[in-house]
């Protein structure tokens, strides 16, 4: 991410957004050290417009139909709780990985606390960002269980319920039957 110029990153990011819009596909973003700039570009490219949100089948969460659904996924989200809430209000979905299990990672815990479960996914980002108790070793897909367990603990609900909801969220986001 620091191996090319910012304007090159931004050009190709905008081009990928335009391509997703042309093909009416979801957008998956890994924003690193560019939180506000990412948000600005998404707004400039009208990713959260009512027209774009109308392209996708309505998703239903525990509280009913999602108020807004832009089919934007912030993969491996590590931004602030406030930024996460802004994204969700605009219709984005956030995905959290192993760092939510780290003892000193209060920022991601606060984000999970603040975001309705219907707007969250769990992931591994394998082979990186390995959750506790395997931190420091290569990550594996099977370790997503530890991320889901931590989300369940934060939300105060069962592992099974959290696993089911986040799995359904993923299926609905990617339109998997």
Enumerate the predicted regions with their spans.
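Catalytic pocket-lining loop regions of alpha/beta-barrel enzymes
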Residues: 5-121
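Alpha-helix N-cap and loop-to-helix initiation/capping positions
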Residues: 1-12, 135-143
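Residues that scaffold the ATP/ADP-binding catalytic core of kinase and kinase-like folds
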Residues: 41, 131-132, 173
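Ser/Thr-centric signal marking residues that sit
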Residues: 38, 101, 124, 147, ...
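Mid-to-C-terminal alpha-helical segments outside catalytic/metal-binding sites
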Residues: 19, 142-177
């Amino acid at each position: 991410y620091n191996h090319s110029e910012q304007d090159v990153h931004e050009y190709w990011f905008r081009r990928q957004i335009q391509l997703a819009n042309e093909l009416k596909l979801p957008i998956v973003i890994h924003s690193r050290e560019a939180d506000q700039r990412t948000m600005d570009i998404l707004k400039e490219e009208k990713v959260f417009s009512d027209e774009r949100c109308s392209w996708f089948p309505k998703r239903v969460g525990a509280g009913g139909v999602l108020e807004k659904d832009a089919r934007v996924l912030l993969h491996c989200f590590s931004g602030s709780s406030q930024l996460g809430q802004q994204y969700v209000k605009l219709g984005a979905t956030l995905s959290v990985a192993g760092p939510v299990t780290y003892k000193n990672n209060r920022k991601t815990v606060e984000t999970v606390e603040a975001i309705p479960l219907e707007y969250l996914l769990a992931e591994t980002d394998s082979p990186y960002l390995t959750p506790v108790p395997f931190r420091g070793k290569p990550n594996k897909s099977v370790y997503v269980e530890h991320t889901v367990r931590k989300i369940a603990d934060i939300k105060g609900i069962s592992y099974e319920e959290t696993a089911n909801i986040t799995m359904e969220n993923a299926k609905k986001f990617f339109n998997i039957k």
